[in-house]
Amino acid sequence: MTKVSKSKGIIKKVLIYFTIISIACGMALCYQIFIFENSFAPAGINGIATMIQYKLHFSVAYMSLLINAPLCVLTFIFLDKSFAVRTTVFALTFSVALLLLQYKIIDLSFLSYKTDNGTSTILAPLASGVINGIIYGAAIRLNSCTGGTDIVAALIHKKWPEQNLLWIIFALNTGVAIAS
């Protein structure tokens, strides 16, 4: 392997991890701007964590870490190591960024979207869904995922490879969305 091809490989890895970190921060920002301000829960494990935050005032960031840590370990054991590392980077970055935003260490409250009555039942969930959908797609294209139900779906897909991964993710997330 030549020096040029090694440096291209390193640059590619740096760009991949930079993108994963960026989209994880984008997801945390989306939670702060749309989800928390309008009191709704998105799909997935973080949707469950959001419902717990609303009821028990236990931060989604901490709950996400508690749920994703063992899932990331399982991913490292049973699935592709690169996928596991990238997913762990996403999950850690999301939680840290969310903590920084929730505790106003980085105050971006001026960006928050809220209607006059205090909640948006259509635009905020729609905007959040579009943004998070783009983030999910980007994460999957980078051989990563956003954690939670995506990891559970990947583990199910490993056990039953004839099942379509995207349909498994859809089914799990739909179940959580209906529960919220």
Q: Where do the model's predicted regions map?
A:
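Core subunits and conserved enzymes of cellular information-processing
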Residues: 2-180
